[in-house]
């Protein structure tokens, strides 16, 4: 009985825990938007950057996936030893910066490196989120928060498809757009 009492004391109060889960779900939604948006915008990107099918394949697959998968292990290790909210915050900053950098890509390698960094940044989220949920809820009450968090995996692609459709519609009707300080940008660049 004493272990159960100690275990319950380490959990956050209910409202703080649910706020944390909700924030992580929103981050998960954005992570999936970032993953899917490239695939939807690939035709205008391919045309503007003069990319080959092989380069497109590398951007859609290995550039993100290899780094996302391989960084998950060391980041999971770090999540067990360091402050998880700090790790996730740094990860969100890295992937947001890398996503924005995707919009400034002028060559294949620019976009490839940006996608690699998106993978590295996004790899922080799930190990930390699941660990935070584990710490924030007793074992018998973890199903709902994990379920809420993982809904981001379905909502994110839906949001990406909606945003991608809007950008593709815009791309077909707009030429270059002059942004003060940044100069001329294609509509696909603004999607990032």
Feature roles, as predicted:
Residues 1-33:
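Cytosolic juxtamembrane N-terminal segment immediately preceding the first transmembrane helix
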Residues 32, 36, 64-73, 123, ...:
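Residue-level signature of mid-helix packing/kink "hotspots" within the transmembrane helices
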Residues 41-70:
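Extracellular/periplasmic helix-loop-helix junction of adjacent transmembrane segments
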Residues 44, 76-77, 166:
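Membrane-interface helix termini in secondary transporters
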Residues 50, 83, 104-110, 121, ...:
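Helix-breaking motifs and short loop linkers at transmembrane-helix boundaries and internal kinks
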Residues 70-109:
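Conserved MFS/SLC helix-loop-helix module at the cytosolic interface between two early adjacent transmembrane helices
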Residues 113-153:
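Cytoplasmic helix-loop-helix junction between adjacent transmembrane helices
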Residues 149, 153-192:
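Helix-loop-helix hairpin linking two adjacent transmembrane segments in secondary transporters
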């Amino acid at each position: 009985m004493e272990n159960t009492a100690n275990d319950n004391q380490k959990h956050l109060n209910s409202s703080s825990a649910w706020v944390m889960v909700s924030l992580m779900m929103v981050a998960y939604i954005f992570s999936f938007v970032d993953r899917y948006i490239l695939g939807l915008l690939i035709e205008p990107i391919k045309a503007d950057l003069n990319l080959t099918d092989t380069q497109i394949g590398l951007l859609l697959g290995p550039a993100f996936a290899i780094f996302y998968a391989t960084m998950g292990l060391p980041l999971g290790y770090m999540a067990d030893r360091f402050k998880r909210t700090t790790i996730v915050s740094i990860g969100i900053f890295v992937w947001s910066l890398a996503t924005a950098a995707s919009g400034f890509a002028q060559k294949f390698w620019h976009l490839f490196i940006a996608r690699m960094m998106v993978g590295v940044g996004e790899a922080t989220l799930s190990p930390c989120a699941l660990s935070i949920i584990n710490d924030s809820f007793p074992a018998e009450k973890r199903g709902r928060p994990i379920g809420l968090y993982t809904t981001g995996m379905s909502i994110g692609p839906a949001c990406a498809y909606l945003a991608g459709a809007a950008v593709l519609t815009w791309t077909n009707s707009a030429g270059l757009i002059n942004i003060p300080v940044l100069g001329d940008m294609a509509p696909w660049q603004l999607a990032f």
